[in-house]
């Protein structure tokens, strides 16, 4: 398995990683905590952005960033993988369920993400403006063209 994270560059070289995984019979796992909600044409994350939807074996993410700012997270995978994690993942076994309000807020945010590109477009416009103004003020900015801008 090759875990990759799309935090700094939204691509994470996923097409190349997927090709290598296919060649060697490996699984591909992506931590998309910094991409789901605003990366990709429909905000589905780096796998959508890189045109490998349906070809990433395990996607993990958080509900604490673009999906509402609450707590909690998720793992999306085949049923067998999720069941194995439910039985073997100690943090999962010894954690509490999410509060209903957090679940409801996250569902609402997912509905907003699916409803259109207006919020994503505004985010990207704000990120470009921030990057432009901070650079003009003499700050050195790290990272690629991403809504998360390390200063």
Positions of the model-derived regions?
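Active-site core of PLP-dependent enzymes with the aminotransferase class I/II
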Residues: 1-25
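Amphipathic alpha-helix from the class-I
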Residues: 101-121, 132-135
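General beta-strand structural signal in soluble alpha/beta enzymes
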Residues: 1, 28-32, 60-61, 94, ...
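Conserved PLP-binding catalytic core of the aspartate aminotransferase-like
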Residues: 121-128, 136-151
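Short, small-residue-enriched loops and turns at beta-alpha junctions
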Residues: 3-8, 35-38, 92-93, 150-151
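A short glycine-threonine-serine/GTX helix/turn-capping micro-motif
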Residues: 72, 89-98
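Active-site PLP attachment segment
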Residues: 42, 48-84
């Amino acid at each position: 398995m090759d875990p990759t994270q799309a935090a700094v560059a939204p691509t994470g070289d996923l097409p190349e990683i997927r090709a290598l995984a296919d060649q060697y019979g490996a699984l591909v796992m992506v931590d998309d905590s910094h991409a789901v909600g605003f990366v990709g044409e429909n905000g589905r994350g780096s796998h959508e952005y890189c045109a490998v939807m349906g070809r990433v074996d395990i996607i993990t993410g958080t509900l604490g960033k673009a999906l509402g700012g609450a707590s909690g997270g998720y793992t999306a995978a085949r049923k067998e993988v999720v069941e194995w994690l439910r039985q073997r993942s100690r943090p999962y076994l010894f954690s509490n369920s999410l509060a209903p309000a957090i679940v409801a807020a996250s569902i609402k945010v997912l509905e907003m993400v699916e409803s259109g590109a207006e919020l994503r477009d505004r985010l990207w416009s704000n990120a470009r403006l921030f990057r432009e103004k901070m650079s003009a003020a003499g700050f050195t900015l790290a990272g690629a063209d991403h809504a998360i801008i390390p200063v």
